[in-house]
Amino acid sequence: MKKNPKISLIGSGNIGGTLAHLISLKKLGDIVLFDVSEGLPQGKALDLMQAATIEGSDIKIKGTNDYRDIEGSDAVIITAGLPRKPGMSRDDLISVNTKIMKDVAQNIKKYAQNAFVIVITNPLDIMVYVMLKESGLPHNKVIGMAGVLDSSRFNLFLAKEFKVSVKNVNSIVLGGHGDTMVPLLRYSTISGVPIPDLIKMGLSSNKNIEKIIDRTKNGGGEIVKLLKTGSAYYAPAASAIAMLESYLKDKRQILTCAAYLQGEYDIHDLYIGVPIIIGKEGVIKVIELQLTEEEKILFYKSVTEVKKLIDTIQ
C-alpha cells in the first residue's frame, strides 16, 4: 500500500486550519498541525478528523506542540507569525516575524531537510528569504505564496468587470507581495484575448481597469478592514494548496510565486514574484517574461522595495 505524503503545517490559526481542511478534503496526505499554543493544534486536529470521517476520509491529522513530529515531512507550509491588524502594513510585521521564521527554519533544518517548503507568513518576500538562508535548504525547495493569490484577486475583479466566468480569465501579477505588485495587462487575458485589446473593442475602459489594478494591490488590506479582527485566510490557503498539489502530483503547473532568483530578470540573491514551473523537483524553471520599458520600471521599483526591507534585517 502506497504511503501517504506527510504534510506539516506550522501555525494552526485560520490559514493553518483551512489548509488542513483542504488537504483532508483533497486527500493529499497525512497532516501534522503544529503550533506553540498548547491545545490549539490538538483541538483543531480532533475537529478536522471528525469532519473527515463524515467525508469518509482516513487521512491522519495530528496536532502537536513538538517540532519532532514534523520529522520526515514531504512538504511544510508555514503560516506562523503575527497576523496583520487594521492600519498595519505587511512591512510593520517584519521584526517580530523574522524572529519566528528563524526559529521555524532551524527546526525544519533539523527535522525536515528534504521537504518542499511554502511560506505564507508576511511580509512574504522577506520571510521566504529568511527561511532559505536560515534553513540551508536548496532554493528550488523553498518558495513563497504570493502571485497565485494576487492573480486570483485580479482574475475575480476582471471576471466581474467583463461579466464572464473566472474560468475564462488568466492573469499574471509580478513583483513583491504588497503595494508595489505589478499586474501585467499585456499578459492578462479573457479567453486568450489580452485586456488591452478588449479595452480597444470598447468592452471596458482604462479608467475601470486602473481601479481594478488598485483594488488588486489593496486586496489584502480591503479584507483586513472589513474583518476588523483578522486577515484573509480562505484564498491564501487555497493558493498554497494549488502550489502544494503541483509539487506532490508533479503537475508542472506555471504559477506565479515568490521564487529565488540567481540572474533571471537580472536579479541576484532575492525572492520576488515571478512565474515558475512547479513539479516533483520543486521549482523546475523560472519563466522570464519579455517586459516593456514601462513594465520593467514598475517591476524593478517593486524589487527595490523588497531589497530595502531585506537590508533592515541584515
Swiss-Prot record:
SS bond list: none
Keyword DNA repair tagged: no
EC numbers for this chain: 1.1.1.37
Residue positions binding NAD(+): 11-16, 35, 97, 120-122
UniProt protein name: Malate dehydrogenase
Pfam family, one: Ldh_1_N
InterPro entries xrefs: L-lactate/malate_DH (IPR001557), Lactate/malate_DH_C (IPR022383), Lactate/malate_DH_N (IPR001236), Lactate_DH/Glyco_Ohase_4_C (IPR015955), Malate_DH_type3 (IPR011275), NAD(P)-bd_dom_sf (IPR036291)
Highest rank taxon of the organism: Bacteria
Species lineage: Bacteria, Pseudomonadati, Pseudomonadota, Alphaproteobacteria, Rickettsiales
Job description of the protein: Catalyzes the reversible oxidation of malate to oxaloacetate.
Ligand binding (substrate): 84, 90, 122, 153
UniProt-recorded Gene Ontology molecular function terms: L-lactate dehydrogenase activity; L-malate dehydrogenase (NAD+) activity
Keywords: NAD, Oxidoreductase, Tricarboxylic acid cycle
Active site per the UniProt annotation: 177 (proton acceptor)
Keyword NAD: yes
Gene expressing this chain: mdh
Swiss-Prot/TrEMBL catalytic activity: (S)-malate + NAD(+) = oxaloacetate + NADH + H(+)
Family of the protein in this entry: Belongs to the LDH/MDH superfamily. MDH type 3 family.
Gene Ontology biological-process entries: lactate metabolic process; tricarboxylic acid cycle
PANTHER family attached to this UniProt entry: L-2-HYDROXYCARBOXYLATE DEHYDROGENASE (NAD(P)(+)), L-LACTATE DEHYDROGENASE
